[in-house]
Amino acid sequence: MNRRFFILATIGAGTALALLPQNSKTHIDIAPFKVIEAVQQTLFPKNLKAPCASQFGATNYLLLVSSHSSFVKSDLKFLKYGADLLINYKNDFLTMNSKDRDEALRDFVDSSSKAENWVALLLFYTLEALLSDPIYGGNRNELGWRWLNHNTGQPQPKLKFAQIE
């Protein structure tokens, strides 16, 4: 791992952790989210016409929503499991350049149905981060909406999560 990548990963993880609700911070294992962040950056890299994952806050979104009680716990468990599966498949994935990461991710998806399902689930949540209301922690600066030229419906949410009684 080079120094620049380490610093960027640490800043990204620290920022994401700081955005979590105070009572959920003790229950978050940040290691899988470093892998998830790298995969999201591979799926939505810089230099495309679409916003890149770091620009629209894909990992921050997933950290925020997965810490809420309404998040499907089996999804969180599978997301963490898949991150471990990927690192076991390619232990140098986090230190690869973007081209090698893309190739490794394609090989990983082809290696098993679990790997394919994991990437599909992660893509689902990444697209949700791109297109959801910014109040939920993704779609930073409405980048996803602006990219698609989308006009939002009204009224927009005022609270992050509905109050369940």
What are these regions (language model features)?
Residues 3, 28-37:
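Onset of an N-terminal alpha helix
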Residues 17-29:
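Bacterial Sec-dependent signal peptides at the C-terminal "C-region" and cleavage site
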Residues 34, 38-41, 50, 57-165:
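Mature-region segments of soluble proteins
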Residues 1-12:
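N-terminal secretory signal peptides and thylakoid transit peptides that target proteins
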